């Protein structure tokens, strides 16, 4: 018998629970609204901000104070662009941060839809890595990879952009696999040659 199907929004919350995330920061808005419904039944504490930039800085401060991954959630367009300053700050301060942003429906991307912004492009210089989800099935694995990238090597921010239709898409939960990212190998040991040159 197959498992019950979950919406992409439910997968977001279930994935955060799977990753032992206890606290997230954010501000609801149209494109990310579906992700707020499953939070009612979740043990994850949501701290409501009055502005996305503030929620991003709160998540960053939380990560710095606790040593845990900071998580911030925002809507599309201006909601996502308001995260650029906290993302850049987290990048400069080596703070592990996961930003989850809503996006207009997949078929509307690139058509100047209401509150559409090219979030992945806008945040490339402000993050270690970013993702645009194209299927709800990707959500658990991508969020686990995002956490891995944000917390390993030199810590920093990772953004996951999720179109609204993907948040509403129903699929089965697929438990994330072990992280295997052949192209991502953070340097953990200092280079002795570079240390000698600096001295």
Q: What is the role of each PLM region?
A:
Residues 1-199:
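N-terminal alpha/beta PP-like core and its mobile active-site loop of ThDP/TPP-dependent enzymes
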């Amino acid at each position: 018998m197959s498992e019950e199907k979950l919406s992409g929004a439910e997968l977001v919350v279930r994935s955060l629970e799977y990753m032992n995330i206890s606290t997230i920061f954010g501000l609801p808005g149209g494109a990310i609204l579906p992700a707020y419904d499953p939070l009612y039944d979740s043990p994850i504490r949501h701290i409501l901000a009055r502005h996305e930039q503030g929620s991003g800085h709160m998540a960053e401060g939380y990560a710095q104070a606790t040593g845990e991954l900071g998580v911030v959630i925002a809507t599309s367009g201006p909601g996502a662009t308001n995260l650029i300053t906290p993302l850049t700050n987290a990048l400069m301060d080596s703070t592990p941060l996961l930003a989850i942003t809503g996006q207009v429906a997949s078929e509307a991307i690139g058509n100047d839809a209401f509150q559409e912004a090219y979030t992945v492009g806008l945040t490339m210089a402000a993050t270690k890595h970013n993702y645009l989800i194209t299927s709800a099935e990707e959500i658990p694995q991508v969020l686990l990879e995002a956490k891995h990238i944000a917390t390993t090597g030199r810590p920093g921010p990772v953004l996951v952009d999720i179109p609204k239709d993907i948040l509403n898409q129903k699929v089965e939960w697929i438990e994330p696999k072990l992280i295997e990212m052949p192209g991502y190998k953070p340097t953990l040991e200092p280079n002795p040659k570079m240390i000698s040159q600096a001295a």
